[in-house]
Amino acid sequence: MLAGCRVALPRGLRCCQRVLSWVPVVIISLVVLWSYYAYVWELCLVTVTNPAEKAAYLLIFHTVFLLFIWTYWKAIFTPPKQPTKKFLLPYAEKERYDNEERPEAQKQIVAEFARKLPVYTRTGSGATRFCDTCQMVKPDRCHHCSVCGMCVLKMDHHCPWVNNCIGYSNYKFFLLFLAYAMLYCLYIGCTVFQYFILYWTDTLSNGRAKFHVLFLLFVALMFFISLMFLFGYHCWLVSLNRTTLEAFSTPVFQSGPDKNGFHLGIRRNLEQVFGKERKLWLIPVFTSLGDGFTYPMRMACESRNPLLAAENQWEDDLTDEESQAYCETSHITVHIEK
């Protein structure tokens, strides 16, 4: 894999940038640690008196907590996958590109090299997608992250709360992190609520525990509402096989822009992210389909076989292998006007 193609910055500035980028993660970690203390100690061990209730609360809480922490860890420390060297402009072409002053001639150099690569999406003007910073042709759905300083396969967005770029290699972990974070907040809110009422009405009077329990409910509710909207938005994206970037900027193919260019049907869209083994969908292990460089495309398939477009209106049961087989027979060529 390629090392990150980073813009040259003074060493001191880079160091400060790296340190500051961890601030949101530290904030979230401190809130989670406090919530663990408040729930386990102040609620379960101090406030709850029924032994059976206490044991049940602690058992379920730690199960949800471990899943939440596991997915958060994976979202933070799973590096985004980068394009391989075959997408990097070779030395000879790079020399020609750098020495050429005419933009049209530069586009022609890139287009000639890109004909050897499995790339089908284009810029808005129809040119080959090329990263000037990394000096490489961008694979489909790949974008350059200015924060990470590198091109990321199937880039969705850069998330400051995990200090990582979310893309092909870790999007499943990010979704599971949102889901288990919501479940964590929901479970805390549901189990704390009855004791919140008791403290609020002064039925219980433990001063220190009262503060933690009352504040715990407010924090859990606040995070749950925020996460609910974010998770719902990403569920919508997954159902359409889109990334956040593609939702804001429609992918462009040879025949033009198509916001549903990668839409394969809800079931197959889910499998693109979570894989075919449903027993592994809720576990933070990598199961996404493909290699990160090529993707089944509805537009490519339909342009090759127009009957497929009508057929898809009635049947949505093609396997990913069949869909990919259709797409692999379709090749898109860029024509540069002189």
From Swiss-Prot:
Q: Which GO terms describe its molecular function?
A: protein-cysteine S-myristoyltransferase activity; protein-cysteine S-palmitoyltransferase activity; protein-cysteine S-stearoyltransferase activity; zinc ion binding
Q: Where in the cell is it found?
A: Golgi apparatus membrane; Postsynaptic density
Tell me, what is an example of a GO biological process annotation in this record? peptidyl-L-cysteine S-palmitoylation
Q: Which reaction does it catalyse?
A: L-cysteinyl-[protein] + hexadecanoyl-CoA = S-hexadecanoyl-L-cysteinyl-[protein] + CoA; L-cysteinyl-[protein] + tetradecanoyl-CoA = S-tetradecanoyl-L-cysteinyl-[protein] + CoA; L-cysteinyl-[protein] + octadecanoyl-CoA = S-octadecanoyl-L-cysteinyl-[protein] + CoA
InterPro entries xref list: Palmitoyltrfase_DHHC, PFA4/ZDH16/20/ERF2-like
Q: Where, in residue ranges, is this chain on the Lumenal side?
A: 42-56, 194-210
Report keywords, A-Z: Acyltransferase, Golgi apparatus, Lipoprotein, Membrane, Metal-binding, Palmitate, Synapse, Transferase, Transmembrane, Transmembrane helix, Zinc
* Keyword Membrane in annotation: yes
This molecule's function is given as: Palmitoyltransferase that catalyzes the addition of palmitate onto various protein substrates. Has no stringent fatty acid selectivity and in addition to palmitate can also transfer onto target proteins myristate from tetradecanoyl-CoA and stearate from octadecanoyl-CoA. May thereby regulate target proteins association and localization to membranes. In the nervous system, probably catalyzes the palmitoylation of synaptic proteins and is involved in the differentiation of dopaminergic neurons and the development of the diencephalon.
Q: What is this protein called?
A: Palmitoyltransferase ZDHHC15
- List the source organism: Xenopus laevis
